[in-house]
């Protein structure tokens, strides 16, 4: 699971925006972050809980749509788990789907799944299957999303890349970002990695206790 936040999700922080945030406030936040010391890159994302369906199975998943594809590979790594082959974001009218999700749905590249978002149900072709360890994901290019749903999504997350992952830097950055009314929450990749490390250490202790008890 730790590999997810080290090798596959390669951004350092994620600001989640309120559903009622207006464009002017979003632009002000972006401008401030672009000028904030140490911030290298930003990427707007749309993130929404969905259902993926085939004749065999229904899976709860997360739909991810980047506003721009030009720097997407700086924030996420799309690759085949077995071969290590690196993929570009699909622009052939199809989606990227996480590996375990594809396995559970019984689909491969070239197959079609049903995407249910609220009251909308659309058919989506799978172009690539990507390595993933935590949760289930489907990724759509912004133009494909518009084609399927009749308009652009309300981009509700802002991903950040920077080098300084020290506690002092991230505390100051978090305090700055949370001064904006339009921001609901901020999460740091370093915190997620720490949580996973702590969980694994706890499991190791449990295993040792079980072995000693046995």
Residue ranges and their predicted role:
Residues 18-20, 97-101, 162:
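Structural motif
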Residues 27-109, 123-125, 129:
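Short beta-strand boundary microenvironments
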